[in-house]
From Swiss-Prot:
Belongs to the eukaryotic ribosomal protein eL8 family. The keyword Hydrolase does not apply. Non-catalytic component of the H/ACA small nucleolar ribonucleoprotein (H/ACA snoRNP), which catalyzes pseudouridylation of rRNA and is required for ribosome biogenesis. This involves the isomerization of uridine such that the ribose is subsequently attached to C5, instead of the normal N1. Pseudouridine ('psi') residues may serve to stabilize the conformation of rRNAs. The H/ACA snoRNP complex also mediates pseudouridylation of other types of RNAs. The H/ACA snoRNP complex mediates pseudouridylation at position 93 in U2 snRNA. Essential for growth. Directly binds H/ACA snoRNAs. SUPFAM superfamilies: L30e-like. One of its GO terms (biological process) is box H/ACA snoRNP assembly. This is H/ACA ribonucleoprotein complex subunit NHP2. The keyword Ubl conjugation does not apply. It comes from Saccharomyces cerevisiae (strain ATCC 204508 / S288c). The gene is NHP2. Component of the small nucleolar ribonucleoprotein particles containing H/ACA-type snoRNAs (H/ACA snoRNPs). The protein component of the H/ACA snoRNP contains CBF5, GAR1, NHP2 and NOP10. The complex contains a stable core composed of CBF5 and NOP10, to which GAR1 and NHP2 subsequently bind. Interacts with SHQ1. Interacts with NAF1. PROSITE patterns: RIBOSOMAL_L7AE.
Amino acid sequence: MGKDNKEHKESKESKTVDNYEARMPAVLPFAKPLASKKLNKKVLKTVKKASKAKNVKRGVKEVVKALRKGEKGLVVIAGDISPADVISHIPVLCEDHSVPYIFIPSKQDLGAAGATKRPTSVVFIVPGSNKKKDGKNKEEEYKESFNEVVKEVQAL
């Protein structure tokens, strides 16, 4: 029983990587900078680790509120949102507050990485937002990958 579940997880992960090209036609024209296949995988892993440490804000309202409050981190935006007006203001807001942002091709992948069953349009990774003491170990786990991703995003 446990073995089947593991195999199911592995096939699910490989599916998301294989679907990168399949999801490209649905990406919005203003979705720039768009993550490459390799960076997309790295970003999703970082989101997954950050959500385990409870250091993510999900959804447009939460992300906009956090940006206006001046929190720092990384904004990950899904590039296949319809209608586009839902997220069109977020890149401008990020640039105003000098917060790095990146687009990824799929809202389904972003939702799955963010530990929700629903597709998610925007995720804001805010390191250190979890004030609990037990979150320290989990935070250290993803901090390194978070810093790597931020450097790559700023290079784009």
